[in-house]
Each structure stands twice: as C-alpha cells, then as structure tokens.
Regions:
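Terminal substrate-recognition subdomain of acyl/acetyltransferases
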Residues: 12, 27, 176, 181-192
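Conserved acetyl-CoA pyrophosphate-binding loop and the N-cap/start of the following alpha-helix
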Residues: 127, 131-139
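Conserved beta-strand-loop-alpha-helix junction that forms the acyl-donor binding cleft
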Residues: 151-167, 183-186
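Acetyl-CoA-dependent GNAT
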Residues: 34, 38-119, 124-126, 143, ...
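Conserved N-terminal entry element of GNAT/NAT acetyltransferase domains
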Residues: 9, 16-45, 49-50, 192
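Conserved active-site alpha-helix within GNAT-family acetyltransferase domains
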Residues: 134, 161-179
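Active-site acidic-Proline motif in GNAT/NAT acetyltransferases
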Residues: 124-126, 130, 161-162
Length: 192
C-alpha cells in the first residue's frame, strides 16, 4: 500500500467518527417516504425518462448508459445493482452500486478491488433541492452495509473536480478525497 493511500485511509478513519453521529441525527428528521427499487422490466422505462439539467450532463452519465453498463458488468460476471429512487410511487432518480473490479474493468483504481462503490447517483432536474440526493446516499449506504457481495472495508466513489455540489454532499457523509483520480474524476473513500 503506497504512503499517500495509507495517509488518506487514516484521514478517513478519523473523519468517519465525526460525521457518523451528525448524519444519524439529521436522517431522523428526513421524510421516510423515499426508497429504492431494483431496476426491472416494470420500472425501467420510467427511470429512463429521468434526466438532469443541461448544465449537469457533464457530471453524470445518462440513465440508459448506466443501465447498459450494469448489464455489461453483470454479464461479465461482475456486480452491479441499479436502482430507481422513488418518493412514494414517483420516480425521482437513479442510483447504481458496484462491487469489486474483477476482469471487467481494466483500468480500475486500486480501491475498487474488494470494495463497494456508489457508482452512479442522479436526481431528476424536477426533483432537485428537496433533499432527495442526500437521503438517497443514506439509502445507498444502507444497502452497501448489508454487504450483498460479502464484507468489505470501504465504499468509494468519484466525481468531476468541478462538481462542488457532489463534493459537499459526499463530504457530509464522511467521504474523504484520496488524491487519486480515475478517468479525470476525483476519488473519495468512506470506511464502512
């Protein structure tokens, strides 16, 4: 393990304790109607209709691309969990969780091996600024902490350097930037 990576992990462990108690209190005040549902033949079309604003398209792949990536990953014996994000029965966003990197991702960062990732998160432009993104991260982390692919030490994600909204959202959950990049995006890690 290189020194820079080890230092990042130490910062993650320290920050995690500080953030956990804050987020537990805040989540108790959030509307509990938001939930996630696995993408299936019944809901895929309504999820494909969701999109971010024109100015946000550089920050997140379209849902059709994400669902194709999930399919390609799963058929290559990898792990991808695509979900619709719902407020009651209304679709408001999309999330995808990944695990490991196996043979299907040639240029995977070291942190991907044996760890979970919050691979995609988007909230439709019509449902933003309502706290859904923040609550969706909590739902995603709850799913990850059920360890559907087995135990893991970390959850990681990446975002464009210009995406300050994502940076602040993930930082509020204790994700710490490692200083590493993948495909031009900043990698941030959370100890589970």
């Amino acid at each position: 393990m290189n020194v820079k990576y080890r230092e990042s992990i130490t910062r993650i462990n320290d920050k995690e304790k500080e953030v956990k108690s804050k987020n537990i209190l805040e989540l108790k005040e959030v509307n509990n109607m938001l939930h996630i549902e696995k993408i299936n033949g019944k809901n895929v079309w309504e999820i494909l209709k969701l999109h971010v604003s024109e100015s946000q398209k550089e920050f997140v792949a379209a849902n059709d691309v994400s669902i194709i990536e999930a399919y390609a990953t799963i058929t290559a014996s990898g792990f991808a969990f695509p979900f619709g994000i719902y407020d009651n029965k209304t679709p408001v966003g999309f999330m995808m969780i990944g695990y490991d990197s196996a043979d299907y991702w040639e240029d995977a960062p070291d942190i991907a091996r044996g760890n979970y990732s919050l691979w995609r998160l988007m909230i439709d432009e019509n449902y933003q600024k309502k706290g859904f993104g923040r609550e969706a991260v909590a739902l995603g982390l709850d799913f990850i902490k059920s360890f559907p692919c087995g135990k893991s030490e970390y959850c990681w994600l990446s975002y464009e350097p210009e995406n300050e909204v994502a940076r602040q959202l993930y930082r509020s959950y204790g994700f710490i930037e490692t200083g590493d990049m993948v495909s031009g995006e900043i990698i941030a890690v959370l100890k589970l």
